[in-house]
């Protein structure tokens, strides 16, 4: 064993190349679908899905993405709040952003036709006839004399004297609270708008008047109940309002001065989706139960479409009511035919992992966020597919999906674990509110020949037991691919494979054979193999590496690690325990060597690169171990997440480190600590793999980042910019408050440059060194001249400074 004195801590030094061999490719895989409901084209042949930076246009015949509409790239933080088809031109698509920008595109060719700007924040928008209704913040001058924080405007299209398109605003109403907006046309082609707050619905009806083109009458209905309203949907004069108890309040004619709502109640949880069909003859509803309910309004008869696989977030109905587009909680869209309630198309991206471990929006608590996940993703043996676990129904069901990065879609999915979700908690956004159990984490890996998959699911019967007594149940499952049914079939289930209440901390397939390895908190390493001539899997070898009976405290059990690896020929198995990495012979299970990483924290990951090198990562240290000479090749200190991947040749490997502001993908060679390539993330990386000849990073927003390799997006990623000729104001709408853009020097990226004074304290924080360490500011001035704290790191290219404390 090599002692700590033989370790030399390397500094972050960038290898100077003319070209970065691991540059980011133009790949648009993954991403989360926005909460904005899907939009049908007028001919009902296409559906529009909104993502973070673009709108995807999908064919309702093939389910393929045929085109993308990108948001302008010279404006930062564009958050869309509404995507609407023009009532006058079937090819014009309006995109309204929260910042007040309105972009009009020709969706047939993705051309940006014109842009307009509202000078205040927009919360919601909806078309009714030729009028565009928008809920905005009340202008500062008006809000000073009123407590109403929101204003509803009716915007009518027009043309200015200069010939540019504008929208002329008309004030409709003000209100202090706002939850949802919808609009519709009554039988006489007059507009109706419905706005709901937490306890009342506000209806604005457009009525004709001789001397004025528009006049509005307002009606309010107060719901005298403790439940809060959640959603609203209009169809002509009929209105449906839902509350957080799952009730639907139906008002048949809001034009009447007095009305008594009809109550429809089946859902036990708040409703997310409401939509009318067949001109008000049917009402569709859906929520956390994952069941679509179709209400026949005349008879109140109900029809159910269950087993959708995830909660329903929104519902959209085609213009001819022949199909329904359901946005599901697992980040997918399913279109259902109305005639037989069968699936027409299914657009499935990266299924989200509804877990308390992936809620962080930054890398500050990365290790804590990922601590509960054993290994939720892996790569198929042929290096083509990404295997991932995903949860739904607030952690009550966990599935394994096979994701094809070339098609950017899920090609296969099966349920790996389920805890009864017959009664989903109403406080579904709060994981600690679950008192009836949930699946905590799932590990997944596949055999070398790709015919078998092993999964580990860990679940608890009561959240209080998990938090106070750390009581968990574990199941090891082996699955075989059914070539006829094209799905995975359960072969063997082993409950508590490491003993009662013992948790499996690591799962790994052996490199060259169809065997699996597990490590558990009973301080044993177990090898599992398929019995000859049988469909049953069994433990064939056990290695005891510690005496857990003398370790009574839970604190000492944190020495168990997720680090587990095999050599390329399966002759050596490496596993982590405490601060040490142990290497044993896979046949005799005798110990070969031990590597100690002092002051590095808990071991997070390890991987053999080739026959000579093995990379070991702890929370605060990276070490390259030479297996042949049993010595340290090199090591360096930083804060690491534990994510690790190596190229197929073993000549390069990638890790993720982090600080309080960002994460970095750093690519090394096993021979030297010099950085081959470095890339910055403002999001939280949750998975790192090597596929299709490049390193693939999946972040907590389900965005896939690809570095090198042959993966490219099928759709051209041409970006749009707002220029001076296409920009106009919405008439005189709050013109005095319009923030003008500096069009002489447009922002070239999604972020502007923000410079700050570089201080010694900032350097200490940047490199994670003690605050009393001396820093020679003059000596490092030149290398730090481009690295002001707060500057977007991607602008540095491959230039990175090294801390000099001489």
Swiss-Prot record:
SMART domains in UniProt: WD40
Parts of the chain that traverse the membrane: none
Main localization category: nucleus
Any GO BP: positive regulation of rRNA processing
Gene3D superfamilies: YVTN repeat-like/Quinoprotein amine dehydrogenase
PANTHER family assigned to the protein according to its UniProt record, in alphabetical order: WD REPEAT-CONTAINING PROTEIN 75 (PTHR44215:SF1)
Name assigned to this protein: U3 small nucleolar RNA-associated protein 17
Function: Involved in nucleolar processing of pre-18S ribosomal RNA. Required for optimal pre-ribosomal RNA transcription by RNA polymerase I together with a subset of U3 proteins required for transcription (t-UTPs).
GO molecular function annotations of the record: RNA binding; snoRNA binding
Keywords of this entry: Nucleus, Repeat, Ribonucleoprotein, Ribosome biogenesis, rRNA processing, Transcription, WD repeat
Domain of life the protein comes from: Eukaryota
Subunit composition and interactions: Component of the ribosomal small subunit (SSU) processome.
Source organism of this protein record: Schizosaccharomyces pombe (strain 972 / ATCC 24843)
GO cellular component term of the entry, any: t-UTP complex
Pfam families xref list: Beta-prop_WDR75_1st, Beta-prop_WDR75_2nd
Stretches forming WD repeats: 266-305, 448-489, 499-538, 598-635
Subcellular location: Nucleus, Nucleolus
């Amino acid at each position: 064993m090599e002692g700590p004195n033989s370790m030399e801590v390397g500094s972050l030094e960038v290898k100077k190349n003319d070209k970065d061999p691991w540059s980011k490719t133009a790949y648009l895989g993954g991403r989360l679908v926005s909460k904005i409901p899907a939009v049908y084209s007028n001919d009902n042949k296409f559906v529009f899905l909104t993502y973070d930076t673009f709108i995807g246009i999908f064919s309702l015949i093939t389910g393929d993405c045929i085109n993308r509409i990108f948001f302008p790239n010279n404006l930062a933080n564009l958050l869309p709040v509404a995507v609407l088809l023009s009532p006058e031109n079937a090819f014009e698509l309006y995109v309204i952003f929260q910042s007040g920008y309105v972009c009009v595109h020709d969706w047939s060719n993705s051309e940006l036709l014109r842009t307009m700007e509202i000078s205040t924040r927009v919360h919601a928008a909806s078309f009714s006839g030729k009028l565009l209704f928008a809920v905005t913040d009340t202008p500062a001058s008006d809000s000073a004399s009123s407590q109403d924080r929101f204003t509803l405007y009716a915007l009518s299209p027009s043309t200015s004297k200069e010939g540019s398109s504008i929208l002329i605003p008309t004030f409709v109403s003000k209100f202090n609270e706002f939850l949802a907006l919808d609009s519709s046309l009554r039988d006489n082609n007059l507009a109706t708008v419905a706005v709901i707050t937490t306890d009342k619905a506000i209806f604005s009806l457009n009525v004709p008047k001789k001397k004025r083109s528009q006049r509005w009458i307002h009606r309010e209905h107060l719901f005298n109940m403790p439940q809060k309203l959640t959603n609203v949907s209009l169809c002509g004069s009929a209105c449906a309002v839902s509350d957080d108890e799952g009730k639907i309040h139906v008002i048949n004619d809001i034009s009447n001065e007095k009305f008594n709502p009809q109550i429809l109640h089946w859902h036990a949880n708040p409703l997310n989706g409401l939509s009318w069909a067949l001109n008000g003859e049917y009402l569709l509803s859906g929520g956390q139960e994952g069941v679509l309910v179709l209400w026949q309004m005349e008879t109140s008869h109900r029809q159910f479409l269950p087993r959708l696989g995830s909660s329903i977030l929104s519902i959209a109905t085609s213009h001819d009511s022949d199909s329904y587009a359901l946005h599901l909680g697992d980040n997918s869209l399913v279109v259902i035919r109305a005639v037989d309630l069968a699936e027409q198309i299914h657009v499935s991206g990266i299924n989200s992992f509804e877990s308390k471990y992936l809620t962080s929006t930054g890398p500050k608590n990365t290790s804590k966020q990922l601590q509960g996940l054993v290994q939720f993703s892996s790569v198929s043996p042929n290096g083509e597919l990404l295997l991932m676990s995903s949860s739904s129904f607030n952690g009550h069901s966990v599935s394994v999906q096979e994701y094809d990065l070339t098609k950017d879609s899920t090609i296969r999915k099966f349920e790996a674990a389920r805890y009864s979700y017959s009664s989903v908690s109403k406080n579904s956004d709060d994981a600690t509110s679950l008192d009836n159990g949930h699946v905590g984490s799932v590990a997944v890996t596949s055999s070398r020949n790709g015919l078998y998959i092993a999964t580990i699911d860990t679940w608890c019967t009561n959240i209080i037991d998990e938090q106070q007594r750390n009581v968990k149940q574990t199941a090891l499952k082996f699955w075989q691919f059914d070539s006829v049914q094209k799905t995975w079939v359960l072969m063997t289930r082993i409950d508590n494979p490491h003993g009662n209440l013992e948790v499996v901390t690591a799962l790994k397939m052996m490199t060259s054979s169809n065997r699996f390895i597990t490590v558990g908190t009973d301080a044993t390493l177990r090898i599992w193999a398929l019995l000859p001539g049988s469909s049953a899997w069994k433990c064939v070898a056990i290695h005891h590496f510690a005496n857990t009976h003398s370790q009574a405290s839970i604190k000492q059990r944190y020495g168990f690690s997720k680090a587990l690896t095999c050599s390329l020929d399966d002759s050596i198995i490496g596993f982590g325990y405490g601060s040490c990495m142990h290497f044993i012979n896979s046949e005799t299970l005798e110990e070969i060597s031990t590597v100690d990483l002092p002051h590095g924290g808990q071991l997070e990951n390890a991987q053999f690169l080739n026959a000579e090198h093995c990379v070991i990562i702890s929370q605060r240290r990276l070490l390259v171990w030479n297996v042949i000479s049993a010595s340290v090749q090199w090591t360096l200190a930083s804060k690491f997440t534990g994510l690790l991947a190596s190229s197929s040749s073993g000549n390069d490997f990638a890790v993720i480190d982090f600080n309080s502001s960002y994460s970095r993908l750093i690519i090394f060679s096993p021979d030297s600590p010099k950085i081959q390539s470095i890339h910055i993330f403002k999001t939280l990386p949750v998975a790192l793999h090597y596929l299709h000849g490049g390193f693939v990073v999946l972040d907590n927003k389900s965005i896939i980042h690809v570095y090198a390799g042959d993966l490219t997006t099928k759709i051209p990623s041409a970006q749009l910019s707002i220029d001076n000729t296409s920009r106009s104001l919405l008439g005189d709408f709050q013109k005095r408050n319009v923030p003008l853009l500096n069009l002489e020097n447009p922002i070239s990226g999604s972020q502007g440059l923000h410079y700050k004074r570089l201080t010694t304290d900032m350097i200490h924080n940047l490199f994670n060194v003690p605050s009393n360490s001396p820093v020679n500011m003059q000596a490092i001035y030149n290398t730090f001249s481009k690295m002001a704290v707060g500057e977007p790191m991607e602008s540095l290219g491959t230039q990175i400074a090294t801390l000099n404390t001489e």
